[in-house]
Protein backbone atom coordinates (compact mmCIF):
# COMPACT_ATOMS: atom_id res chain seq x y z
CA UNK A 1 0.00 0.00 0.00
CA UNK A 2 2.86 2.35 0.75
CA UNK A 3 4.24 1.76 -2.74
CA UNK A 4 0.96 2.81 -4.36
CA UNK A 5 0.85 5.95 -2.22
CA UNK A 6 4.44 6.79 -3.17
CA UNK A 7 3.76 6.29 -6.88
CA UNK A 8 0.67 8.50 -6.67
CA UNK A 9 2.67 11.15 -4.83
CA UNK A 10 5.45 11.08 -7.43
CA UNK A 11 2.93 11.51 -10.26
CA UNK A 12 2.34 15.09 -9.14
CA UNK A 13 4.75 17.77 -10.34
CA UNK A 14 7.61 18.08 -7.86
CA UNK A 15 9.08 21.32 -6.54
CA UNK A 16 12.61 20.01 -6.84
CA UNK A 17 14.08 17.56 -9.36
CA UNK A 18 16.27 15.95 -6.70
CA UNK A 19 13.26 14.30 -5.05
CA UNK A 20 12.71 11.98 -8.02
CA UNK A 21 13.71 8.37 -7.35
CA UNK A 22 13.84 5.57 -9.92
CA UNK A 23 11.26 2.83 -9.38
CA UNK A 24 10.34 -0.34 -11.19
CA UNK A 25 7.56 0.25 -13.73
CA UNK A 26 5.93 -3.10 -12.91
CA UNK A 27 5.99 -3.41 -9.12
CA UNK A 28 7.26 -0.02 -7.89
CA UNK A 29 10.32 -1.43 -6.11
CA UNK A 30 12.92 1.29 -5.43
CA UNK A 31 15.99 -0.94 -5.01
CA UNK A 32 17.82 -3.07 -7.54
CA UNK A 33 16.70 -0.82 -10.41
CA UNK A 34 18.11 -1.31 -13.93
CA UNK A 35 17.97 2.00 -15.75
CA UNK A 36 18.31 0.42 -19.22
CA UNK A 37 15.09 -1.53 -18.77
CA UNK A 38 13.20 0.54 -16.18
CA UNK A 39 12.71 -2.60 -14.09
CA UNK A 40 13.91 -3.97 -10.78
CA UNK A 41 16.16 -7.04 -10.75
CA UNK A 42 13.32 -9.37 -9.79
CA UNK A 43 10.93 -8.27 -12.54
CA UNK A 44 13.79 -8.19 -15.06
CA UNK A 45 14.70 -11.80 -14.28
CA UNK A 46 11.08 -12.97 -14.38
CA UNK A 47 10.34 -11.23 -17.69
CA UNK A 48 13.63 -12.40 -19.24
CA UNK A 49 12.83 -16.04 -18.37
CA UNK A 50 9.40 -15.63 -19.99
CA UNK A 51 11.01 -14.14 -23.11
CA UNK A 52 9.22 -10.80 -22.81
CA UNK A 53 12.37 -8.68 -23.19
CA UNK A 54 13.82 -8.88 -26.71
CA UNK A 55 17.56 -9.42 -26.99
CA UNK A 56 18.03 -10.69 -23.42
CA UNK A 57 19.28 -14.26 -23.03
CA UNK A 58 20.45 -16.34 -20.12
CA UNK A 59 24.23 -16.39 -20.15
CA UNK A 60 26.26 -19.57 -20.07
CA UNK A 61 30.01 -20.02 -20.28
Curated annotation (Swiss-Prot):
GO terms, biological process: translation
Record function comment: Binds 16S rRNA, required for the assembly of 30S particles and may also be responsible for determining the conformation of the 16S rRNA at the A site.
GO terms, molecular function: rRNA binding; structural constituent of ribosome; zinc ion binding
Cofactor entry: Zn(2+)
HAMAP family associated with the record: Ribosomal_uS14_2_B
Gene3D superfamilies membership: 30s Ribosomal Protein S14, Chain N (4.10.830.10)
Organism: Elusimicrobium minutum (strain Pei191)
PROSITE patterns according to UniProt: RIBOSOMAL_S14
Lineage: Bacteria, Pseudomonadati, Elusimicrobiota, Elusimicrobia, Elusimicrobiales
Subunit structure: Part of the 30S ribosomal subunit. Contacts proteins S3 and S10.
Keyword Transcription regulation: no
Cofactor binding, note field: Binds 1 zinc ion per subunit.
GO CC annotations, alphabetized: cytoplasm; small ribosomal subunit
Keyword list, A-Z: Metal-binding, Ribonucleoprotein, Ribosomal protein, RNA-binding, rRNA-binding, Zinc
Name listed for the protein in its UniProt record: Small ribosomal subunit protein uS14
Amino acid sequence: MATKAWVAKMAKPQKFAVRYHNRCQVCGRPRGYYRDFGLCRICLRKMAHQGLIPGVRKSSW
